[in-house]
Regions:
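C-terminal-of-GTPase-core extension/linker across diverse P-loop GTPases
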Residues: 1-189, 194-200
Length: 200
């Protein structure tokens, strides 16, 4: 199947293969089996038509499979955003009609292509994002932090990132009964804020 596709000029990323075949192919490191992210650098004047950038660039043929993405950005504007403080950057993006920076879109597309999500832990002295494969359960997510937390896993207190922003603290969420208790088989979602209860 792979040989036929390669001889026909079809990238391996476009093939649908069973997991055991994918494992066998891993050792060969075929470049065409890797996810493809195309970042298009647009002129400022073309930003309002960013949704048509793929068509205008004539790269539709590269974006036929599920493992390909194109993200249009304007590098000049991204440089300006990077040099501003967060409040000014938000106002600047709002003036341009941008909901998020190009860098954020590239990161999101990369995570999506690689099959990763992020969850957050919030503490007194540290807030942190953790990257895990999509479909990871709560106990294995706890193992990303420390193997002792995974072994002693009892429950996970879970809320959405947006809810934490609205209430301000986990204590406020607890007071309003907005923290859910989930077991070890709970599938962690992108943007979950989790406090792991564990035995020491």
């Amino acid at each position: 199947m792979c040989r036929t596709a390669l001889e026909a000029g079809q990238p391996l990323r476009d093939l649908t293969m069973p997991p055991e075949d994918l494992r066998r192919l891993r050792g060969f490191q075929f470049l065409s089996s890797k996810p493809l992210l195309i970042v298009l650098n647009l002129d400022e004047a073309d930003l309002p038509q960013a949704d048509k950038a793929v068509e205008l660039a004539g790269i539709q043929s590269f974006l036929t499979g599920p493992n390909t993405r194109a993200v249009p950005i304007c590098a000049k504007i991204e440089l300006e955003i990077a040099q501003l403080d967060p409040a000014d950057a938000s106002a600047f993006m709002a003036d341009l009609g941008l909901k998020e920076s190009g860098l954020d879109r590239v990161i999101r597309a990369s995570y999506d292509l690689l099959g990763y999500i992020s969850f957050f832990t919030v503490g007194e002295d540290e807030n942190r994002a953790w990257s895990i494969p999509r479909g990871t359960n709560a106990q294995n997510a706890a193992g990303e932090i420390h193997s002792d937390i995974q072994r002693g896993f009892i429950r996970a207190e879970v809320c959405r990132y947006e809810h934490l922003l609205a209430r301000g603290t986990l204590a406020a969420l607890r007071d309003h009964a907005e923290l859910r208790l989930e077991g070890k088989e709970y599938i962690v979602l992108d943007g979950d804020v989790i406090n792991f209860r564990h035995a020491t």
